[in-house]
Swiss-Prot record:
Predicted to be exported by the Tat system. The position of the signal peptide cleavage has not been experimentally proven. The keyword Translocase does not apply. Residues 37-93 form the 4Fe-4S Mo/W bis-MGD-type domain. It is found in: Periplasm. This is Periplasmic nitrate reductase. One of its GO terms (cellular component) is membrane. Binds 1 [4Fe-4S] cluster. Binds 1 molybdenum-bis(molybdopterin guanine dinucleotide) (Mo-bis-MGD) cofactor per subunit. Component of the periplasmic nitrate reductase NapAB complex composed of NapA and NapB. Keywords: 4Fe-4S, Electron transport, Iron, Iron-sulfur, Metal-binding, Molybdenum, Nitrate assimilation, Oxidoreductase, Periplasm, Signal, Transport. It comes from Histophilus somni (strain 129Pt). The gene is napA. Residues 1-32 form the signal peptide. It is an enzyme of class 1 (oxidoreductase). Its EC number is 1.9.6.1.
Amino acid sequence: MNLSRRDFMKANAALAAASVAGLIIPVKNVNAADTSITWDKAVCRFCGTGCAVLVGTKDGRVVASQGDPDAEVNRGLNCIKGYFLPKIMYGKDRLTHPMLRMKNGQYDKEGEFTPVTWDFAFKTMAEKFKSALKAKGPNGVGMFTSGQSTIFEGVAKSKLFKAGLLSNNIDPNARHCMASAAVAFVRTFGIDEPMGCYDDIEHADAFVLWGSNMAEMHPILWSRISDRRLANPDTVSVNVLSTFEHRSFELADLGILLKPQSDLAILNYIANYLIENNAINREFIEKHTKFKRGETDIGYGLRPQDPREQIAKNVKTAGKMYDSSFEEFKKLVAPYTLEKAHEISGVPKEQLEKLAKLYADPNKKVVSYWTMGINQHTRGVWANHLIYNIHLLTGKISLPGCGPFSLTGQPSACGTAREVGTFIHRLPADLVVTKPEHRKIAEKIWKLPEGLISDKLGFHAVAQSRALKDGKMQVLWQMCNNNMQAGPNINEETYPGWRNPDNFIVVSDPYPTVSALSADLILPTAMWVEKEGAYGNAERRTQFWRQQVKAPGEAKSDLWQLVEFSKYFTTDEVWPAEILAKNPAYQGKTLYEVLYLNGQVNQYSNDELKGRLNDEAYHFGFYIQKGLFEEYASFGRGHGHDLADFDTYHKARGLRWPVVDGKETLWRYREGYDPYVKAGEGVSFYGQADKRAVILAVPYEPPAEVPDREYDLWLTTGRILEHWHTGSMTRRVPELHRSFPNNLVWMNPNDAKKRGLKHGDKIKVISRRGEITSYIDTRGRNKCPEGLIYTTFFDAGQLANKLILDATDPISKETDFKKCAVKVVKA
């Protein structure tokens, strides 16, 4: 049989899309085989796509799952990880009791992990918290939390720390992945999160992936893009930019390999091209945008004594923006010619020009997608801005099939970390602790005395590790993440603080992760459908699920842990005496009483459960999830962050906010789609006081570390399809573990040959901060250009993040996991 090139491409891409999406599951057979299985809806535990699943339970266990055919997001499909969701809960080493390091019947930093009661664990924790608060103040204690926590848990922990302990020292691991996107959204539009939705996929003519391997990281969305591309081969294109070739290149019409950090130059070149070729939408620009110029030479978020910080001119004003004009913007991007962009990026000129023409074509609807390649970047905020610039200059924004779209990597990085506000500076609905009027709103809604919430920021993720090491912080509670494996520069900056004898580290986790085994107290955690939950995905969709099975042994949900722990503090112990003197009704109350028995959180009866499982509600005596949600939702209703009522979400397959009069919003800021845009306005970026979005001029600046004679290779890190983050769940699924049991290092064959290496050799990867032992792959799914290697961080036996420099974006404080210098030698 003869196949044309087009037919071959279509067949190959369809096969790739099917395998990536995990379309090997005869889900209908599950129902047919066993009618005694009880099915209920839930949300996938993994990435930020927000796929809906049907969960099958029998005899108190989750025994099956399948894609929910009624869900708009995934339309009945699951990726390979989603298919094996039931097995993440039943690893043989599941934790079932609190475990405290003890010797001779007492806590000892060098002791052995010993089972203790919850009461003993909490009394020990409370003693350490109170001691640290007294010695170091509010930032003496802290929490490192997660974009995997449920919305209810996010509200509970934000209240416990910010309103109870009066400490803003709580930050999520979303700092490592979404902070740059969030900061740039707010700086540009005045409101966080994308204006578009997944429906853009079925409307777009072109997809541009900036630093995103959607084929493996967002496979269900990739299956939709593949379907769109293959059904319209003459009109729809896929364009992929990356520092190495990955599976998304298999479908790409234009695959671009660029040098690390050079995305800044390419994006500025495109802006220059649009202006020089009169391909800008002048009417849109004049009506709906304003120009600003960013501060430059802002450093790399390293320790102040680092020489790179010492020579940077504007470290203290890194986030400052200055009023500007179109003419100044034009002048500032003018140096980014085709020649200069080629010189900096190494990308062939014809490819750069083809990409620029794609954005310039007034008849092409373009969606730009990006993930960690843009966000995990020492200039990640800038890179986000530069993508927005292109869409604002062309007016290709807030329309079906047109817009910039930052994809999230965790199931509720949006819904919990960003919308609830579990960052050191945030409160719900884009409010911030640094603004007095915002604190007053929170105090009123939470029924707290005026002036209680602090304006003092806590330590961001990387700074928490430094503070523990430096003795500025003494207690850390890590919840729903594995930062000892996932964080940067763990040998030099994280581990020393955790094992400092003056510090006390608590880890809440279902499994004995690298973090848990490095802690002093491990709290066993209920996971996924062992609790009632809610997530918010990348397209602003809020989705609920009910508890469907009970957790094993003494394992308790994070929500239970947070609320129960609040009983061990009184206001007299942690609130200022002057505030209590003015508000005597709060004196002597426990934090549990003032935060969770405030007449709002506890107003809903457990009768509403109608006998359904809900361990937390029955323990506390009221429908706590509903109370927390309704209190939280009141922050955003009427302010562009409207959420539907609690009961609606249990009936629906999720709704995209703002939800006004029962109707979700698909495209924000555009008349006819967004209820907050008035008739006749056309477009209104209403998050800004003047309703104008910012077009920001910022330059290319080099990375914090580059290869040299000794460390002669770039290292970039990321994930693979089969595993998620640090593998603490997926490596306990036998099928996923067998499919990819250990980490590898992908290298160009020529680089391997120069070093006397070949495919399969055992090697050492060495940076200025540490080394790992691994195996080389020169033939696999990832194809690296000469001078760059790629590896992952899922393997606890190869702690790849020992190698990573803890440089951050000075504005967002997000870590750059994509660029550092290493050398490779035979082991």
